[in-house]
Amino acid sequence: MANASEPGGGGGGAEAAALGLRLATLSLLLCVSLAGNVLFALLIVRERSLHRAPYYLLLDLCLADGLRALACLPAVMLAARRAAAAAGTPPGALGCKLLAFLAALFCFHAAFLLLGVGVTRYLAIAHHRFYAERLAGWPCAAMLVCAAWALALAAAFPPVLDGGGADDEDAPCALEQRPDGAPGALGFLLLLAAVVGATHLVYLRLLFFIHDRRKMRPARLVPAVSHDWTFHGPGATGQAAANWTAGFGRGPTPPALVGIRPAGPGRGARRLLVLEEFKTEKRLCKMFYAITLLFLLLWGPYVVASYLRVLVRPGAVPQAYLTASVWLTFAQAGINPVVCFLFNRELRDCFRAQFPCCQSPQATQATLPCDLKGIGL
């Protein structure tokens, strides 16, 4: 959106420097997004310990962010160069609609996928047996991925069917809305806000669930009912029945033990969520919620600007705020690998195992056998 300056004036150098800085920043975002997302995708594919449903969903999210950066950021760079050129032609209406469709598609895919991830995280903590039996494998992850892409495809069509062209070089890859307050644009914004809000409500419900069970209740001994040495009732441990079955008891047959689950190697014999599994699931919840919160923080300013443009008037939003909000959406395409690396210790360990050259000398020394350490190696 650079204005043409007078020849020989001092504005040309400043505009050229601003254009160079903008193109360099976009190139850096493109490289970081592609390198980080492709690296994490390869790490999840190669490491067998990561072949679980949460990491399959993370793999799809990384691939979608990489595709968004590859499809959108070069187009924005080309639009910026065309706008800065003296005889540059603006991008066509078809190209703007295609880029707006791709941006809306990837945005809604991330929103719907994060909603599905939030629901599965809640089930993994609150209903662990059901999650372990029905939702822990790859079929559930494949269904969630397909559903997220299908819903995103259905939601991305309406905003670009009748929309106009882009009005600045930052807009082709942003969620272009019709500036006349059309119901399609307003419905698009309401749907996005509803999906993101529902995702945070799921995590809020999960937080309340963990808070209510943060401390174990003290065990209360309930005395068993005893008649002629047959113990039954809430406090019975079943030892009397076991003794009678083994032939050590006398008297009448003890009552049937109600509520005791038979132990066995089958799928129904899986225990409840133990402490180590709970810590693992909790770390995954923290990582995915950090991704969800950053999605809200980086897309929120642009959604607010779009609301103002739709409900008030197109010129109600300052151009500086609109440009900054669009650049925040660009940064969202490359921030997820950094968040995953910071919040997930399992991913860091797998990364060090796959790439030993990235380990520090202290970590390499810690992995040496004791006899090698003793001789100074």
From Swiss-Prot:
Membrane topology, record value: Multi-pass membrane protein
Keyword Translocase on entry: no
Signal peptide: none
Parts of the chain on the Cytoplasmic side: 46-56, 120-140, 205-287, 344-377
Protein's job: Orphan receptor. Possible candidate for amine-like G-protein coupled receptor.
Disulfide cysteine pairs (residue numbers): 96-173
GO molecular function: G protein-coupled receptor activity
Organism of derivation: Rattus norvegicus (Rat)
Family recorded in the similarity comment: Belongs to the G-protein coupled receptor 1 family.
Name of this chain's protein: Probable G-protein coupled receptor 27
Gene: Gpr27
Annotated InterPro entries: GPCR_Orphan/Phoenixin (IPR051509), GPCR_Rhodpsn (IPR000276), GPCR_Rhodpsn_7TM (IPR017452)
